[in-house]
Amino acid sequence: MKTIIALSYIFCLVFAQDLPGNDNSTATLCLGHHAVPNGTLVKTITNDQIEVTNATELVQSSSTGKICDNPHRILDGINCTLIDALLGDPHCDGFQNEKWDLFVERSKAFSNCYPYDVPDYASLRSLVASSGTLEFINEGFNWTGVTQNGGSSACKRGPDNGFFSRLNWLYKSGSTYPVQNVTMPNNDNSDKLYIWGVHHPSTDKEQTDLYVQASGKVTVSTKRSQQTVIPNVGSRPWVRGLSSRVSIYWTIVKPGDILVINSNGNLIAPRGYYKMRTGKSSIMRSDAPIGTCSSECITPNGSIPNDKPFQNVNKITYGACPKYVKQNTLKLATGMRNVPEKQTRGIFGAIAGFIENGWEGMIDGWYGFRHQNSEGTGQAADLKSTQAAIDQINGKLNRVIEKTNEKFHQIEKEFSEVEGRIQDLEKYVEDTKIDLWSYNAELLVALENQHTIDLTDSEMNKLFEKTRRQLRENAEDMGNGCFKIYHKCDNACIGSIRNGTYDHDVYRDEALNNRFQIKGVELKSGYKDWILWISFAISCFLLCVVLLGFIMWACQKGNIRCNICI
């Protein structure tokens, strides 16, 4: 009995060597693409969530926490507002003739001189900020019959009463205040900015004590404009021990124009002019510290990198900055569609192509080949198709940045209370712009992602078709991204297929012969290997059972004697 069972087993092993799957005269070549265990979800035009092997975040959502001092020239206002520095508040004297790209105003800034207001504060602030300089030129105005350089205890300069250094407070000399009528031409090639003011006493007595006349008037004009201001005498809330005020005005004199000042009292006269420069300097309110670093883009929260096309840190920016959007995240696909590799390929270790899943561990390329032949198995990347895909994807991020980065600044808008409706309209317009940009950004990224996925799929298909054209009738498409090669194909042969030097005519006769032989015994089902192995195992089992049954029957009849020795 032992002999018969042993012979049956040997017979099965011998028979097994003739199964098609173990024939050394064939090989399997699969084409596939890179895959990762955990991909990144992105949005496309046709799919809200599709997994890709790699993606780049396009929204900058955090700042450095500090304002970088390079490459922009930052001027820290510290305790001074720009207007206080412009007027010459005593505690802002250190800002005289300073220059900046960005003037940073702090929340702790305060005025420490005569109480004042600026009827068009926002326009003056913006005008001076964009000029980027406090360069001041003194001029010799001829004020006759009046006392100059008035001061106040509310504006101490050291131990003495003082006033704004860029303004000249005129008041009566003796008991007279003659009418002042002075002119100052602009013979330069640039605009001149003159700052002047009107004093509003708190009482009629203060008015006559300073200017003699019960009511003064100030008129400042050029060829293009004229401003007339009549002082409003009356008490106001007390500030630094005073209930009177100074209103600040400004006039721009163009080259070739002339400044004319006429007044019979209450004039706060200019001492000279500020040079106006054209540029892209600006001002920003921020409490972020200024640090030693480099960043093109600055927000009130601090500097941010501008290597992304979008940001949601702050709407207010300066420099070359990403476009502000509402989204916290927008991911740009920089890899292909991700189909994680199946961890088990059956008990016989079969390989599969891109139709079934991707391949993990392809670190040297996105597309490649796996093969199974008489020399074993192997894998290699296809660098040409990989590079073709990478070249087209690499430029995407730069193109999106070029489309969206602002090469100018977005300043905060300020309006006085009487301009409330304008402010509401401005806010509505800004919000609408942000909504529109946010929608455009999402659409742009979805379109780019769709193109990337279609592109990488196309490169995979191109490589597959290229391989099919090389093999022709020497191989059969197995339907899963693999080819069954009907001739002996060693590693050198596989290499020739990969590099495009394969000559199908060399192997044509062998392939045709093997194809006809194998086709005679192969099943057409996609599960033919399984069916063959299962039927083979059942046949061997039944053969053993039949032989064992025959032996048992023969023993019972006495035809065979079985001795068991212990």
UniProtKB/Swiss-Prot annotation:
Keyword NAD: no
Gene Ontology CC annotation, any one: viral envelope
Extracellular compartment spans: 17-530
Record GO biological process: clathrin-dependent endocytosis of virus by host cell; fusion of virus membrane with host endosome membrane; fusion of virus membrane with host plasma membrane; viral budding from plasma membrane; virion attachment to host cell
Mod. after translation: Palmitoylated. In natural infection, inactive HA is matured into HA1 and HA2 outside the cell by one or more trypsin-like, arginine-specific endoprotease secreted by the bronchial epithelial cells. One identified protease that may be involved in this process is secreted in lungs by club cells.
Function comment: Binds to sialic acid-containing receptors on the cell surface, bringing about the attachment of the virus particle to the cell. This attachment induces virion internalization of about two third of the virus particles through clathrin-dependent endocytosis and about one third through a clathrin- and caveolin-independent pathway. Plays a major role in the determination of host range restriction and virulence. Class I viral fusion protein.
Record protein name field: Hemagglutinin
Gene it is expressed from: HA
